[in-house]
Amino acid sequence: MEIPKTERGSGLFIQPVHFDHIVSSGSTLLDLAVSGSRASEGGIPAGIVMEIFGQASSGKTAILSSIAAQAQSKGGSVLFADPEGRLDKEYARIYGMNIKAENYAQPDFVTDLLKMIWEFKSSENSTDVFIADSIAALSTKMEMDSDEGDKMGGKKAKDLHQLMRKTCRKIAKSNLLVAFSNQLHDSMSAYGSRTRTPGGHAIPFYASLRLEIKVIRMIEEELSVDRAILGSIRETVVLTGSDKKSAAKKISKITGVEAVVRIVKSTVDDPFRTAPVRILFGYGIDDVGANLQWLKTVAGLSKYLAVDKEFIRYQSAINYIEEMNYEKKLREQVSYVWHGIEHDFRERSLRKPKQFL
């Protein structure tokens, strides 16, 4: 597929400029939002610190687990630091992440996390990932040893500054991606944002990539429960005439969430892009579903475009893509349209070379 090109001044701005080491998030649209102007398929480059933050149950661990699984699928090493101590191995397997004793740890303090990053031995030919989920759960020795604790959070903020300063220097020229998750807390200040991420300003300052994830709606499915599926229970119940003729009961269930990821800071590519992400319980990131919906919305179509066919029903389009193994072709289609949109925006904003005063 040909990637759009644009001219800037007297030089030629050619997309993309490929990174040496890059890992996918598992979401085509999120990959493109992160670095679509720098790499044809986008993705998260190694050698940086990234942070993803959001409310509880918004999908932070899902995104991090997917990143880890993508890295492992390409032969990369992963170390999952779990200060919260609640990562379930079966949950990790849903996303394809393989968690064993040697690549899982439960650090207590910020200093423990720094030591783990420095002792992590990154390979030469693959993209490796170090994950900490979440920073908010880390403590300091002052907090644990003192009766009063670290009330103002000053010691934790200081330790995080040291952690980030040393970490950024270590990984700057490596093939290691350091990814943190963080929570959103209510801000006690009467000014500015009503929410904040705990730990001070260290991570927002040093992180090259910050992602905010928000759930926009629950994915709800409805099922008609036919009396026939009651099996042997039905044989023990005496049904009246009206019961026999009554319609099947409809039961609804929340099966996932639709979220939007917003890039609030990026030194990788253009910031403030957004990407829709679908997360299905028991399945993981639904890239096919998100891509189909995005194409339909962006192109203003009345039907779902499934590579070479159109479908009225959403599930029929998904089934066709999976049966024909068209997942890659669908990703390429989405990438082509996305690059076309970016090309048009860049063409519109072209300016003559800047004059120095």
Predicted regions and their residues:
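Short amphipathic alpha-helices and their capping/turn segments at secondary-structure boundaries
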Residues: 113-130, 167
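Loop/turn-to-beta-strand initiation segments
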Residues: 75-77, 126-129, 173-180
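Phosphate-binding/switch region of NTP-binding enzymes
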Residues: 153-294
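Terminal-proximal interaction/regulatory segments of ATP-powered molecular machines
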Residues: 304-357
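N-terminal cationic and glycine-rich segments that engage phosphates or anionic surfaces
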Residues: 143, 186-190, 307
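Flexible beta-alpha connector loops of hexameric P-loop NTPases
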Residues: 100-109, 143-159, 191-195
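The Walker A/P-loop phosphate-binding site
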Residues: 1-102, 118-122
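Conserved ATPase-coupling elements of RecA-like P-loop NTPase cores
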Residues: 138-147, 171
